[in-house]
Amino acid sequence: MRLIKLHHLRPAPGSRRARVRVGRGEGSKGKTAGRGTKGTKARAPVRPGFAGGQIPLHMSIPKLKGFKNHKKVEYSVISIKRLCEAYPSGGVVTRDNVMSVIGKKRGFVKLLSDGEVTVKFDITVDKASAAAVEKITSAAGTVTQAR
């Protein structure tokens, strides 16, 4: 039995086609090399984005205007209704508890007044609307705002 080595490996006959070398002499793919005669496509390739004499798309679309405020503070909001669903017995609710209800790990939290309060809450959030504070304090609870 003969030992097979890497240099013995060959592709199966007919599985590989030879690369066509164009533009070499006057044969079938010679002279114009399958590009036809004359014209832009026979000469140099057209650059990407070239629109053939009309204004290109990247020049016809307006530039962005204005600016992006990098100091903008975005709040994740939670309503009183959702808070009551998560904590039906009320009690002390920290900012981290609220973040776990929202499903986020970082950022700021704002409490909104959508819904009715039936139990006492002692809640700590970054911000709360005036109506939300009024609803919770009317149910004998407290709201501590961190910001």
UniProtKB/Swiss-Prot annotation:
Name of the encoding gene: rplO
Subunit and partners: Part of the 50S ribosomal subunit.
Composition skew (Basic residues), residue ranges: 1-22
InterPro entries in UniProt: Ribosomal_uL15, Ribosomal_uL15/eL18, Ribosomal_uL15/eL18_sf, Ribosomal_uL15_bac-type
Keyword list, A-Z: Ribonucleoprotein, Ribosomal protein, RNA-binding, rRNA-binding
Disordered: region residues: 1-49
Record-linked Gene3D superfamilies: 3.100.10.10
Keyword RNA-binding assigned: yes
A single cellular component GO annotation: cytosolic large ribosomal subunit
Protein name in UniProt: Large ribosomal subunit protein uL15
Job description of the protein: Binds to the 23S rRNA.
Disulfide cross-links: none
A biological process term (GO) from this entry: translation
GO molecular function: rRNA binding; structural constituent of ribosome
Family note: Belongs to the universal ribosomal protein uL15 family.
